């Protein structure tokens, strides 16, 4: 049986705020709302997640997007913008002492965002963009690269090589589903050990994996009810981390509402996932 056995460790953050990702150790969590909506909203979500993860002994990397650049509709809300988001991320780190993650879309953003953000995320649609990968790698920050929905898991060896050969060994490979016909994604759990075999900690994105791209005509749909199903399966296989977007009112969130987990449901979900994780890594 092929298993997720490489014990390579990648650590995000500085000093006491460090969070490690390793396929053979307890999973760490990347969580937060899809997009950064306001300072107050970011602090509210962050406070709840920090308290929860501290109580459960889970390492937390707080995530949020300053710009949702690939919205289905031109009128879709995209976020509060780069400058405002960097100020808020800096204040979140001071207040809560956790590393933060945000996605980047252009080479020019890499140097700016890396001054504050600990983990730079490469969106799935941009996972083969060489110039972006090289620019991100050269910042020296941890890179979380989403596997494109159009890529096989073994194709990520080329993505990983671009980052490593640009001088950055601190790479996380993230599974977020594969295209399966129109408006549908499926999660092939074989991809988790396959990507681990390439030499990187593996993250499973449990919320984007249940997206239905463009499934609501002018916006993306999702099947929130299957987040737990897929997360449990991934943890049973064994992963270094889970990526879960969450919101206190997902049905009215400005983006990705149909696939985000309700904030009030996070405690029970994480407790269940920890139980599976303990068995898998015993």
UniProtKB/Swiss-Prot annotation:
Family membership: Belongs to the KdsA family.
Protein name per its UniProtKB record: 2-dehydro-3-deoxyphosphooctonate aldolase
Domain of life: Bacteria
Alphabetical list of NCBIfam families matching this protein: KDO8P_synth, PRK05198.1
Lineage: Bacteria, Pseudomonadati, Pseudomonadota, Alphaproteobacteria, Hyphomicrobiales
BP terms from Gene Ontology: keto-3-deoxy-D-manno-octulosonic acid biosynthetic process
Main subcellular location of this protein, as a coarse class: cytoplasm
Protein species of origin: Agrobacterium fabrum (strain C58 / ATCC 33970) (Agrobacterium tumefaciens (strain C58))
Catalytic activity entry: D-arabinose 5-phosphate + phosphoenolpyruvate + H2O = 3-deoxy-alpha-D-manno-2-octulosonate-8-phosphate + phosphate
InterPro entries: Aldolase_TIM, DAHP1/KDSA, KDO8P_synthase
Disulphides: none
GO CC, alphabetical: cytoplasm
Enzyme class: transferase
Keyword Transferase (UniProt): yes
UniProt keyword annotations, A-Z: Cytoplasm, Lipopolysaccharide biosynthesis, Transferase
EC number of this enzyme: 2.5.1.55
Keyword Transferase: yes
Single GO molecular function: 3-deoxy-8-phosphooctulonate synthase activity
PANTHER family assigned to the protein according to its UniProt record, in alphabetical order: PHOSPHO-2-DEHYDRO-3-DEOXYHEPTONATE ALDOLASE
Localization (cell): Cytoplasm
Pathways involved: Carbohydrate biosynthesis; 3-deoxy-D-manno-octulosonate biosynthesis; 3-deoxy-D-manno-octulosonate from D-ribulose 5-phosphate: step 2/3; Bacterial outer membrane biogenesis; lipopolysaccharide biosynthesis
């Amino acid at each position: 049986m092929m298993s997720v056995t490489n014990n390579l460790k990648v650590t995000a953050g500085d000093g006491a705020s460090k969070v490690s990702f390793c396929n053979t150790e307890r999973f760490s969590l990347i969580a937060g709302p899809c997009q950064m909506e306001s300072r107050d909203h970011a602090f509210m979500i962050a406070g709840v997640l920090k308290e929860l993860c501290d109580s459960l002994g889970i390492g937390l990397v707080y995530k949020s997007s300053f710009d949702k650049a690939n919205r289905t509709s031109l009128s879709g809300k995209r976020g509060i913008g780069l400058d405002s988001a960097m100020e808020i991320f800096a204040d979140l780190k001071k207040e809560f002492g956790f590393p933060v993650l945000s996605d980047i879309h252009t080479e020019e953003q890499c140097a700016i965002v890396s001054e504050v953000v600990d983990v730079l995320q490469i969106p799935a649609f941009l996972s083969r963009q060489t110039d972006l990968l090289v620019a991100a790698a050269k910042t020296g920050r941890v890179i979380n690269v989403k596997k494109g929905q159009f890529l096989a898991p073994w194709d990520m060896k080329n993505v990983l090589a671009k980052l490593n050969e640009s001088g950055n060994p601190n790479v996380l490979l993230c599974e977020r589903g594969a295209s399966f016909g129109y408006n549908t994604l499926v999660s092939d759990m074989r991809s988790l050990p396959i990507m681990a075999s390439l030499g990187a900690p593996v993250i499973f994105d449990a919320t984007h994996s249940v997206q239905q791209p463009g499934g609501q005509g002018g916006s993306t749909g999702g099947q929130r009810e299957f987040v737990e199903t897929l997360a449990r399966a991934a943890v049973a296989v064994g992963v270094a981390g889970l990526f879960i977007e969450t919101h206190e009112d997902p049905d009215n969130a400005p983006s990705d509402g149909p696939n985000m987990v309700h904030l009030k449901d996070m405690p029970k979900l994480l407790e269940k996932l920890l139980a599976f994780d303990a068995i898998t890594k015993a």
